[in-house]
Amino acid sequence: AYVSQSGAPWGLGRISHK
């Protein structure tokens, strides 16, 4: 898991499990 940046469809500023 990691903190994704703004503009990412699989995150949008939140933590994703990709």
Curated annotation (Swiss-Prot):
Q: What name does the UniProt record give this protein? A: Subtilisin-like serine protease AS-E2
Q: How does activity depend on pH?
A: Optimum pH is 8.0.
Q: Does the keyword Transferase apply?
A: no
Name the UniProt key words of this record, in alphabetical order.
Answer: Hydrolase, Protease, Prothrombin activator, Serine protease
> Which organism is this entry from?
Acremonium sp
Temperature profile: Optimum temperature is 55 degrees Celsius.
Which Enzyme Commission number(s) are on file for it?
A: 3.4.21.-
By sequence similarity, the record places it as follows: Belongs to the peptidase S8 family.
